Amino acid sequence: MWITQEITPYLRKEYTIEAKLLDVRSEHNILEIFKSKDFGEIAMLNRQLLFKNFLHIESELLAHMGGCTKKELKEVLIVDGFDLELAHQLFKYDTHIDFVQADEKILDSFISFFPHFHEVKNNKNFTHAKQLLDLDIKKYDLILCLQEPDIHKIDGLKRMLKEDGVFISVAKHPLLEHVSMQNALKNLGDFFAVAMPFVAPLRILSNKGYIYASFKTHPLKDLMAPKIEALTSVRYYNEDIHRAAFALPKNLQEVFKDNIKS
């Protein structure tokens, strides 16, 4: 048996699996979890793959990309995703997390897949809301959007950021789909003074890129090395990974030169 990961519309990977462990369907999402000899458990959420053995890569990168470029991280908003491991990493800071996800059926089905599921859900500083309107009106230090946002969502979310707040969103991989990344950079650049693409260095099982955006905070100039050194129980993230995440090959520097704002 095998499952197929769509990297781009024209590129696919296949992974051998031993068994299907779970199949859950809701109105808007389909979650399947498989057992794999080489990769442990693999979750397929709407045709996108999550590898249980490597969940820490994205969660550490995104959490500390924001946390280590901000002096304080008091209020965090996570939208359009299910990754509770991201919240687990963010709790290394003295922060409150608002987690917006309407699909409780699918979220609760990750109970055995996310190692810190119960720890996060039971944390007194974690608030799960079905929609943004359910939350108190406030300004955030960090907003993480786990799906590529359109301009209307960007416009709405940026109004919820503090003046020195950071907005991090998922995008297409700059090497695999550079036109999509260009468009995403342009959309964010229309609202922010800083808009820079990055990837997860040495992560070979992903087709994701990301964008760091802010009104004034810079992901490299404002990086605080002492905060990185103070982090405990991290397996992936360090200062070298942080800086390397923003490195682009010569050809992509040329492609994105009119879209990157730094």
Curated annotation (Swiss-Prot):
Gene name, Swiss-Prot/TrEMBL: speE
Listed Gene3D superfamilies: Spermidine synthase, tetramerisation domain, Vaccinia Virus protein VP39
MF-aspect GO terms: spermidine synthase activity
SUPFAM superfamilies: S-adenosyl-L-methionine-dependent methyltransferases (SSF53335)
Domain of life: Bacteria
Active site: D155
GO biological process, one term: spermidine biosynthetic process
Keywords of this entry: Cytoplasm, Polyamine biosynthesis, Spermidine biosynthesis, Transferase
Protein name, per record: Polyamine aminopropyltransferase
Location(s), subcellular: Cytoplasm
EC number: 2.5.1.16
Pathway stated in the Swiss-Prot or TrEMBL entry: Amine and polyamine biosynthesis; spermidine biosynthesis; spermidine from putrescine: step 1/1
Organism placement in taxonomy: Bacteria, Pseudomonadati, Campylobacterota, Epsilonproteobacteria, Campylobacterales
Entry GO terms, CC: cytosol
